[in-house]
């Protein structure tokens, strides 16, 4: 969750509501309003000891904006994926939570078969705009690489 401060008062906001798209407000990318400051990002305790993965693809250098990026957190138990969250950035106005991949992987063992399936379902429902069709297969490849990190 996000902790936001304004005028000495704080409020909490779920991470899912922090990033906003142009349909909400074309002038902002986040739910922060005038004089708001993001002061904390809190991760639930249930993710302590989890495996984390992040990868970005950019045209040039590490400081460039990513064309596409992926973040994943996963907990494993007994060789199986007990729980995970996966999100992709750079593919729409807000981070895209990949619930279809999450649902596919829960309770499964990481391995080549799950990599292939993740790659296939990662971009389901995604619609390319002009000149960015390459992002759709890239989403799948990054999802597969994230899953590979669990093997």
Q: What does each model-found stretch correspond to?
A:
Residues 1-151:
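C-terminal structural segment of proteins
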């Amino acid at each position: 969750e996000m902790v936001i401060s304004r005028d000495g008062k704080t409020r909490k906001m779920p991470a899912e509501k922090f990033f906003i798209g142009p349909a909400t407000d074309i002038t902002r990318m986040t739910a922060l309003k005038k004089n708001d400051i993001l002061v904390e990002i809190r991760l639930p305790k249930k993710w302590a000891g989890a495996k984390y993965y992040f990868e970005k693809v950019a045209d040039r250098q590490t400081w460039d904006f990513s064309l596409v990026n992926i973040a994943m957190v996963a907990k494993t138990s007994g060789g199986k994926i007990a729980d995970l969250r996966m999100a992709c950035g750079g593919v729409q106005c807000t981070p895209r939570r990949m619930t279809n991949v999450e649902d596919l992987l829960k309770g499964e063992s990481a391995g080549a078969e799950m990599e292939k399936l993740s790659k296939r379902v990662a971009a389901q429902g995604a619609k390319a705009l002009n000149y960015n069709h390459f992002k759709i297969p890239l989403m799948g490849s990054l999802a597969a690489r994230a899953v590979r990190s669990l093997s």
